[in-house]
Amino acid sequence: MLDVNFFDQLQIGLATADDIRTWSHGEVKKPETINYRTLKPERDGLFCEKIFGPTRDWECYCGKYKRVRFKGIICERCGVEVTRSKVRRERMGHIELAAPVTHIWYFKGVPSRLGYLLDLAPKDLEKVIYFAAYMITAVDEDARHRDLSSLEGKVGLERERLEKRRDQSIDDRAKKLEEDLAALEAEGAKADQRRKVKDGAEREMKQLRDRAQREIDRLDEVWNTFKSLKVQDLMGDEMLYREMKNWFGKYFEGHMGATAIQKRLESFDIEAEVELLRDTIANGKGQRKVRALKRLKVVDAFRKTGNKPQGMVLDAVPVIPPDLRPMVQLDGGRFATSDLNDLYRRVINRNNRLKRLLDLGAPEIIVNNEKRMLQEAVDSLFDNGRRGRPVTGPGNRPLKSLSDMLKGKQGRFRQNLLGKRVDYSGRSVIVSGPQLKLHQCGLPKQMALELFKPFVMKRLVDLSHAQNIKSAKRMVERARPVVWDVLEEVITEHPVLLNRAPTLHRLGIQAFEPQLIEGKAIQIHPLVCSAFNADFDGDQMAVHLPLSAEAQAEARILMLSTNNILKPSDGRPVTMPTQDMIIGLFFLTTDRDGQPGDGRAFASPAEAIMAFDRGEISLQSKVRIRFTDIVPPLELGADWEQGQAVSLETTLGRALFNETLPADYPYVNYEVGKKALGAIVNDLAERYTKVEVAASLDALKDTGFHWATRSGVTVSIDDVTTPGDKADILSGYEAQAAKVQKQFERGLVTDEERRQELIEIWTQASNEVGKAMEANFDRANPIYMMVDSGASGNMNQIRQVAAMRGLVANPKGEIIPRPIKSNFREGLTVLEYFIATHGARKGLADTALRTADSGYLTRRLVDVSQDVIIREDDCGTERGLPKRIGERREDGTVVKAENAETAAYARTSAVDVAHPETGEVLVRAGEDLGDVKIGELISAGVEEVKVRSVLTCDAKTGTCAKCYGRSLATGKLVDIGEAVGIIAAQSIGEPGTQLTMRTFHTGGVASADDITQGLPRVVELFEARSPKGRSPISEAAGRVTIEESDKARKVLITPDDGSEVQEYPVSKRSRLLVGDGDHIEVGQMLTVGTPDPQDVLRILGVRRAQEHLVDEVQAVYRSQGVSIHDKHIEIIVRQMLRRITVIESGDTNLLPSDLVDRVRFEEENRRVVSEGGKPASGRPVLMGITKASLATESWLSAASFQETTRVLTDAAIHGRSDSLRGLKENVIIGKLIPAGTGLERYRNIRVEPTEEARAAAYSVTGYDSYDYEFGNGTGQAVALDDFDFGSYQN
């Protein structure tokens, strides 16, 4: 077999019949598969051992040679080579066809490649191939020209002969008529009898005349056709063709079926055709030029690659190895077989029948029919259903052809090459493991034993518990007591990977250190649930075992949960305490009035704890405590020195809470709810090492659970209190509503106005009742505590239970103007319930659809961005994008802009940023902008910073580390090899499910405001489609005039530069943003709506189009409260704008209207200019992500994405080479991917443990240092150096 690491390119091309024969190990002559009695393959059949190899290892068919010692011998009796049976997965055969057939991909695809090459319409091509018309394949021009006059004479003579014969026979008939009439007269017949005879005779003479005329016309037609006959003419009239063949057979050749195409391709002069087409393109116009351009692409491809066009017509069909189309026996003695075997059998049967007919010399019509059937059989083998009705198997199911084997989710690419099932894995239900450390997971003993079986067996032999591996295996299978001790030893320090499907982002797979547990469920640390999006209502997770030392090192250093605290989409922590933990910590840090021991003072926290234990104070009593070893809160810390004692007005609960935080963290002296906790964790992640953060998180988790239990928070129906004055509030609003209704009935307001007013009235009513309810709650009310702390639920939900349900929407998304006045505590009336469920069900249906749509969007995003990898440190560009970090208030102070978090944070500054007043440089070019730096810049009054961006990066392939900036997942500058494209796609796709589907309507009538929102809007932007409710934008600066007529409305712009007036038709219903006589600038929107990104690109240029797309996508995500960093969206937008359409090709090798990569375009131009030639001109193209993925340089990647057959057809004709730069291509052929540790520069290096690596194991005591060479995985656990973990021990 080939070693994948020893080739750099994979090329695809057209296989000729000779290629097919050289691949083959023999010809399949019979349609038989296996003998039904012996169950052994039939000789020369589809499973023949002589062709494909033995079915049993080292054993020939007849049994003469058995055993490995005969390796390589070919048995003289049965002709089978003695070898391994797995060669039946790789040896091919072939079928020699009795007549050539065309390859359906090349003639039936759109556009038809054969049609383009030969300049034939696909309809005509089909007529020829399926024996409905003859095609002239050769004309002897010289002989025809030479003999034309003599032939004309011959034809003239024949015409005269026909005319003479006609005249003769008419004369004869006329004479006979005279004789008949004379005889009748003599007999004295009546006049009408004579008339009858005369009429009959005249009829006969007319027939004679007509028949003769037809023969003469046919002769003229034959002659005229022959005179103008040229190669590739089609003749659908068989009689005409036969006559012509009879008369002038030696001057031309004509054929039917694939033979005609084959002959035509053999004589086809590619060079001459290319010249001709180039000439047409240079001088032609309109349709001719367009068609010539399209044809040139195909013809030129054959010229450049040296592919033989004859490859599109096959004389032999390859037969794929039998183990790839197996036949297996079922329980009942019946057989299940792959569809391909049926399709191959049809081809072989028809082929053999055709051979027999040809040997018998059957009539042409029968042979042609058989040839047509053979063509159809081969078509359905290659691509069933592409032409005509598909061949069906039992139960009318279309058979799966070779093309179907590659296509779609179940095809070869996506099912077996991009996603394989792996060994050393298991799955089970998950349960919570609150006693675990952040980097641990609980693994059921049985599962662990099965996963670590080989390790345990080896260790048993090493420790002399077993003599050999076999007895060790027996011990493991019988689960002897010693086995469990050995297992315990083997799994120490050996991380496992846990994965929860769907894996929407990279945090869906993380590494943990396994702890053996009883039972059958995997235990998960509560804090990592949000990363996996897991809950414990029956979710399952898969466990995978990294085997080699390298894999373990990667799992421990890169994937351990303690090293994945930050979310890659916005760089904020993802391991946040939730639910119970928040309630516990909130209960702990809250203070209440009227508690026992209020106002007491204590000399130390220990003393306060003693008082608490004796019941003298509660956790929430307001007391004063003296601390000696803390950092005071920031507001007190101005004149504080290290080690100085501080006395604080606080509570015992807060003192306990602060013990969970690092010793040098400023004392937290306020109530900690979800928001405050988020800020604290965020701060920890920014300022402390991974070890300290993990330790603090674990402490927060333990404290949270502990006090949540002690707090006794419960939910009872009595905690839900409806405000007493609800009825009074509602009666006031009822009166208002009745008034509006009355006005409507009198005709004072329209239906639409009434709706809007009612909606306003009832919204106000809901708000007021809600406020009354909130005021009614006691702070110690458990339900109020849950909402207030942010642990679970929100006020809106409580409002529905305790106040009133309010207004609801119907399935169309319109608000129903009748409110639901009851709440769930009181219960709804039947009508109210009906109204409420109506819209709610739509919501559920929406969610199901949204999941699928969102997954498909992620797939397209990954595909378009997969080859964006950090390839170098710095591309050296000085360009960048300005990003807002501050907003100036009216009083002149600058505050942080709301989007600074996702715009400038974690980027690299492109220029030096100076203080606006003092001129001192605050940030140097190339410096990282973190929270602290941004804070400094804002306090200095800087509003905007120019930052490096992937949109302005000059790297040849991928992008550079400086332009990307900080990796949001680690908080440091991104590493070379990081697959930032995939991370971007995941960050955008993962929250996709949260985006709503619907278009929101305000009123019943659809208006221009119904702009698409949510997921469909994101898809619309990334696919670069023209948006719904598109608004035109002005192409020039000038004055506006508005013209109104009955049916239409036009906006006219008179440009300032005096060029011609531009007009924009706009619909009467759209709302204008400009008025008559206004002066507008280039790119200004004319109506309410969204501009088309293509217009923005055309009018305002690339940079503005990029900004427009990024801002619009962000607008959708922000509206749903999802935070994604701009840089992720920028990566996708960059991929959408990577290509350029060539307008004038100049002296380059590019063709006009070609789509080329920006880098290639610039390189080609540089080359031409350096040689003194004329460069090409082009314009940037905005491609949707699907199109951009299919337009990738890599054919493997494109084929595994969508439209597999089309991509492969095209790639084969162009002889495409895949240089294996992206990720998918390398996964498909089984190489290491060129990203992360798979980069060239990271291979063959030694591993030295760093702080980062040790950080993972803050629970592990010291270890001996252990070096190993990279590349020869020992399978031993990766040990770490001695490391002092302070007091944080297991």
Curated annotation (Swiss-Prot):
Any single Gene Ontology cellular-component annotation:
DNA-directed RNA polymerase complex
Record text on subunit structure and interactions? The RNAP catalytic core consists of 2 alpha, 1 beta, 1 beta' and 1 omega subunit. When a sigma factor is associated with the core the holoenzyme is formed, which can initiate transcription.
Query: Mind telling me what this protein is named?
Result: DNA-directed RNA polymerase subunit beta'
**Which function does this protein serve?**
DNA-dependent RNA polymerase catalyzes the transcription of DNA into RNA using the four ribonucleoside triphosphates as substrates.
- Does the UniProt entry include the keyword Magnesium? yes
HAMAP family membership: RNApol_bact_RpoC
UniProt: Mg(2+) binding residues: 535, 537, 539
Entry annotated with the keyword Magnesium? yes
Q: Which organism is it from?
A: Nocardioides sp. (strain ATCC BAA-499 / JS614)
Q: Which residues bind Zn(2+) 1?
A: 60, 62, 75, 78
| Essential cofactor(s) | Mg(2+); Zn(2+)
